[in-house]
Amino acid sequence: MIKLIAFDLDGTLTQHKTMLETENRNVLTALSERYHLVMVGAGACMRIFRQMGGFPIDVIGNYGMQKGIYNDRTKSLDIEEASVPCDKESVDARVTALREKYGFTEFSGDNVQFHASGCITFPILGTTANAADKLEFDPDRSRRRAIYDDVCEVFSDYNVFVGGSSSFDMAPRPYDKRYALEKYAAENGYTLDEIAYVGDDYGRGGNDEAVYKSNIRFIKVDDYRKFPEIINAEGFLN
C-alpha cells in the first residue's frame, strides 16, 4: 500500500520555472489528506518551495544534499544542508579536456559553475550564455546524450545528469534522487513498497532516471497539464 508520494517539480507539476497552477495545487491538497507528500528536486529547497507558492510540503533539494522540513508555525522550511569538498582545479581541468575533445571551446563566462554544496555544472555554452542560444543548442538532448557516457567516465566520482537546455549537472556520489528519496523514506519509517514517485525526466541522463530504474513505483508525467488526469487514473484519489 502506498503511503508516501514523492514528486519532481518542473515538467511534472509545473511548466519549467513557472508557478504551481491552481488545478495541480488542488490535487496536491487532496493527496495530502491521504498520503505523506515530499518534493525531490535538483534545485535548492527554497527555490522549489517558492515556486510552489509556499505549499505545505517537505522538500528535498540538490539531489539530497539539502532537506527542508515544513514548519507549520512559521509556514516555511527548516533547512538542513550537506556539503562535500570540491577539487576545483581537477574539475576545471576535466571540463577543459572535454571541451577540447568535442569542440566546445567557445563559451561565455566561466568554464564551470561551482555550487556551495559541492555540486557542479558543466555549462557547455558558458555561465553567461544568451538564453536563446541555450534553448537552441540541444532541445532534444541528443547532442549531450551522444557524449553522456564519456562525461560519466571522466566524472566517475559524480552522478551526472543531462541538465537544463545546454549543460551537464553533477552531484558528488552517492547523491541522486533515488538515494535522497530512499534516505528520507527510511528516516520517516516507510519501506520501498510504500513509496510512489511522480516524474517526467526518466530518460537517459535524466535526473529522475535513478528512481525510474529502481524498485520504487514510478508514475510517468509527460505533460504537467495532465497531472490531475494521471493521478486519477492511478487510483490515488479513489
Model-found features: residue ranges?
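Residues at the C-termini of beta-strands that transition into short coil/loop
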Residues: 60-63, 164, 222
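Conserved acidic, metal-coordinating active-site core of Asp-based
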Residues: 101, 106-196, 204-207
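Mg2+-dependent phosphoryl-transfer enzymes with acidic/Ser/Thr/Gly-rich catalytic loops
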Residues: 1, 20, 171-173, 177-238
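A general structural motif
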Residues: 1-2, 34, 56, 117, ...
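Walker B beta-strand of ABC/ABC-like P-loop ATPase nucleotide-binding domains
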Residues: 6-7
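Active-site phosphate-binding/coordination module
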Residues: 18-109
